[in-house]
C-alpha cells in the first residue's frame, strides 16, 4: 500500500523504526514505482497516464474481509468518503513519472468496479515484481525513511501470537492535493 493515499493530501514521507523485532518474518518490502512505470509498455503508459482512481480506507479494509458498514458509524463512514487521486504522478523536481498505486484504491473513474479492480490488481502484481523491490530485514534500532510519492510497501507475516514486535511509525504530510 501507500500511506494515506485515501487523504486529500496524501503522505509525503514515512519513517519506521524497530524497537523490538520478530525472530522470523516481519520483513518490509518496498517497490519502486518509478522503475515500474518506466518499464511499462508505451501503450500501457498512454492508457494510465490520465486515469483517476478513488481511494478510501474502506476499500482496503473490505479487501481484507471487514464489514465496514457493520463496524463503522455513519459519521465514521463519511470520514472515509473516497478521494480521487491520479494513477500516475510526476515528480516536480525530476519530472519523472511514477505509478501511484495503493490497496486503498477501490475504483477507476468511469470504470465499473470489477473491471477497475482486475486492472489495478494486475498493475500491482506487475509493479511489485522482485526486480522492483527492496526487502528490508529488520534489526533492532533500524530506521527506514521512504517516499510515499514513489514507493509502495508492505509488511510480511510473522507469528504475532508468539512474538512481541514493536515498530514506531511517523508519517509526514504531503504539501498539496494531487487533483
Positions of the model-derived regions?
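Non-heme Fe(II) oxygenase catalytic core, chiefly the N-lobe of the double-stranded beta-helix
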Residues: 1-143, 148-179
Amino acid at each position: 500500500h501507500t500511506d494515506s493515499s485515501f487523504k486529500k493530501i496524501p503522505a509525503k514521507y514515512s519513517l519506521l523504526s524497530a524497537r523490538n523485532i520478530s525472530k522470523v518474518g516481519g520483513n518490509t518490502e518496498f517497490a519502486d514505482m518509478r522503475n515500474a512505470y518506466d518499464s511499462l509498455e508505451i501503450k500501457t503508459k498512454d492508457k494510465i497516464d490520465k486515469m483517476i482512481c478513488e481511494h478510501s480506507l474502506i476499500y482496503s479494509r473490505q479487501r481484507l474481509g471487514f464489514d465496514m458498514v457493520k463496524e463503522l458509524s455513519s459519521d465514521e463512514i463519511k470520514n472515509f468518503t473516497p478521494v480521487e487521486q491520479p494513477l500516475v504522478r510526476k515528480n516536480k523536481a525530476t519530472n519523472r513519472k511514477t505509478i501511484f498505486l495503493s490497496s486503498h484504491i477501490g475504483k477507476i473513474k468511469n470504470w465499473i468496479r470489477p473491471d477497475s479492480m482486475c486492472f489495478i490488481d494486475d498493475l500491482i502484481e506487475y509493479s511489485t515484481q522482485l526486480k522492483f523491490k527492496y526487502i528490508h530485514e529488520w534489526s533492532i534500532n533500524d530506521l527506514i525513511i521512504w517516499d510515499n510519492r514513489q514507493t509502495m510497501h508492505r509488511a510480511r507475516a510473522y507469528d504475532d501470537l508468539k512474538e512481541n514486535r514493536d515498530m514506531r511509525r511517523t508519517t509526514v504530510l504531503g504539501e498539496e492535493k494531487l487533483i
